[in-house]
Every structure is written in structure tokens, then in C-alpha cells.
């Protein structure tokens, strides 16, 4: 089992790092008290090989040696990788002032500045025990995400999952769509009696639609649009992209266009999936 522990000062980006780990397939637990780590690993044994936890100052043992002892008692088959995220006092003060969130060590008589300084002192011993120390003072969330990903994978490239989904407008539009295209203006196989019982996955329907210049031009234009903007979407740290194609009933035109687009992009570096909502619900 591979265990990644993310610690660091509050406001330095632990939640961002944890989201990266979640996107990479890790089972993530936020703010786990360290005494519960053994119990968590026992429960997850056999069900997942990738586990990530984040711990903040409230869950850290006060003594450096106690932390070392807990980590050294991990099961022999556990591969531990640890991160410590830090930022300057000035940057943390600015971040908390902008978000108006409460610092974990803030009390009624403790100022934000005092809480930030106190946390730095408490966590200083921990910062010396980790494998990777990252100063996020001058990093935005995308820079931090890329840095964590590069440490874990050796590259900043991430696999974007592209979901092509066909649907019928008469049954409602999919709420999860990032891009939505209406193909109800295309020639409709429904009006061909021999094609009506079929779907866009059947060869006679595919042959009919492939012979329509409008259909081919529309598919080509969507392909060009996506190829143009996919690199920008990737740089924005997206993990999933859903392109929905809708016709009236979700049986012929949308199914065919979705199937063709999925085939066109299946040769790319991305993971491509095709789903036909109305066919699956039939």
C-alpha cells in the first residue's frame, strides 16, 4: 500500500494537494488524527492500494519523537511519502484576511497574526521529517497542483477523461454537461420507416447519416472546436470534460454523432468514454 501524508501550515494549500491526490485515484481522508492511522489502513487493506491523508496542527503529536514513532510503526508493506506545505507569515495573513476563514488556532483572545506565528513554531519540527517540502508563497493553485503531480508521477501531464454523451431533449438535458450541442436540425432517420426501429449504433442508420454532408460537416466542426480548446482546458487542471449531444429522442442522430466523435478522439492521449443515455435507460 502507498500512503501519502500531507501536512503543513493552515492556508498553505493542503486541500489543493489532497484534491490532486484524489484525481490520481487515492482514497483521501482530510484531517485524520494520527492515532487513527493504523485503524484506517487496516480497514482499507485489500480494497485500495493508494491512500492519502492530510493532518493539521490540531492532530499532530506535540513531540517530534512521538510522530517519528507513529510513522515507524506503520505496516512493513506500507510505502510512505510525505509532504509539508509552507508559506510565509505575510502570505498566510493575506490569504486568511481575504477568505475571512477562521484559523484552527484562533481563539477569542488570540489574533490571527499570533495564531499563524504559533502554528509555525509548533510545526517546525515536523517540517524537517518530510520527504518533500514545498513553499507555496508564490504559487497559485495550478502551480501547486502541477508540482505535486510532478513529484508523484514524474510529470505534470494529467489524463483528461472526455465523456461523450448522447441524450434526447424530450427527456431533459444532462446537468453535468460542459459543452452541449443540439443536432435536431440534422436529417432524421426516424422518418425512414425501415430505420425507425434502429439506433445510431446500427449500420444502416450509420450509413444513412454518413451520406449526409451536413452531418459530416457538423462532426468536423465539433472536432476542430474541441481540438482547439482542449489544451487550454487541460492547463486549467480539469480532470473531466463532458460533451453532450442531443436530438429529439436520443435514438439516432445524437447517438451517431456521439459515437463518431468518441472514435475520432480515441486515438488521442486522453481517456475517452461514450455513453448513450436513452439507450442505457431503455
Swiss-Prot record:
Residues the record lists as binding ATP: 8-15
Binding site for GTP: 56-59
InterPro entries: P-loop_NTPase, RapZ-like, RapZ-like_N, RapZ_C
Keywords, sorted A to Z: ATP-binding, GTP-binding, Nucleotide-binding
GO MF, one example: ATP binding
Gene3D superfamilies: P-loop containing nucleotide triphosphate hydrolases
Pfam families per the UniProt record, alphabetical: PapZ_C (PF22740), RapZ-like_N (PF03668)
Task performed by this protein: Displays ATPase and GTPase activities.
HAMAP family associated with the record: RapZ_like
Family: Belongs to the RapZ-like family.
Record-given protein name: Nucleotide-binding protein Ssed_0723
Organism: Shewanella sediminis (strain HAW-EB3)
Source organism phylogeny: Bacteria, Pseudomonadati, Pseudomonadota, Gammaproteobacteria, Alteromonadales
Amino acid at each position: 500500500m502507498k500512503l501519502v501524508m500531507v501536512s503543513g501550515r493552515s492556508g498553505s494549500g493542503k486541500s489543493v494537494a489532497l484534491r490532486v491526490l484524489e484525481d490520481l485515484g487515492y482514497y483521501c481522508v482530510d484531517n485524520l488524527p494520527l492515532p487513527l492511522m493504523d485503524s484506517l489502513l487496516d480497514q482499507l487493506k485489500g480494497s485500495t492500494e493508494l491512500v492519502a491523508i492530510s493532518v493539521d496542527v490540531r492532530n499532530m503529536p506535540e513531540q517530534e519523537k512521538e510522530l517519528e514513532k507513529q510513522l515507524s510503526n506503520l505496516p512493513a508493506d506500507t510505502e510512505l511519502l510525505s509532504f509539508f506545505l509552507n508559506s510565509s507569515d505575510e502570505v498566510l495573513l493575506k490569504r486568511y484576511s481575504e477568505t475571512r476563514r477562521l484559523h484552527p488556532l484562533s481563539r477569542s483572545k488570540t489574533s490571527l497574526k499570533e495564531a499563524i506565528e504559533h502554528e509555525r513554531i509548533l510545526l517546525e519540527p515536523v517540517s524537517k521529517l518530510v520527504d518533500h517540502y514545498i513553499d507555496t508563497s508564490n504559487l497559485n493553485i495550478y502551480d501547486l497542483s502541477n508540482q505535486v503531480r510532478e513529484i508523484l508521477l514524474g510529470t505534470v501531464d494529467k489524463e483528461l477523461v472526455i465523456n461523450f454523451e448522447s441524450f434526447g431533449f424530450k427527456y431533459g438535458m444532462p446537468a453535468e454537461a460542459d459543452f452541449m450541442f443540439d443536432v435536431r436540425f440534422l436529417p432524421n432517420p426516424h422518418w425512414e420507416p425501415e430505420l425507425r426501429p434502429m439506433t445510431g449504433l446500427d449500420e444502416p442508420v450509420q450509413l444513412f447519416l454518413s451520406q449526409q454532408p451536413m452531418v459530416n460537416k457538423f462532426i468536423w466542426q465539433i472536432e476542430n472546436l474541441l481540438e482547439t480548446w482542449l489544451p487550454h482546458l487541460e492547463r486549467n487542471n480539469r480532470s473531466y470534460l463532458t460533451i453532450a449531444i442531443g436530438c429529439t429522442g436520443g435514438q439516432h442522430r445524437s447517438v451517431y454523432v456521439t459515437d463518431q466523435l468518441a472514435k475520432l478522439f480515441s486515438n488521442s492521449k486522453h481517456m475517452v468514454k461514450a455513453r448513450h443515455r436513452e439507450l442505457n435507460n431503455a
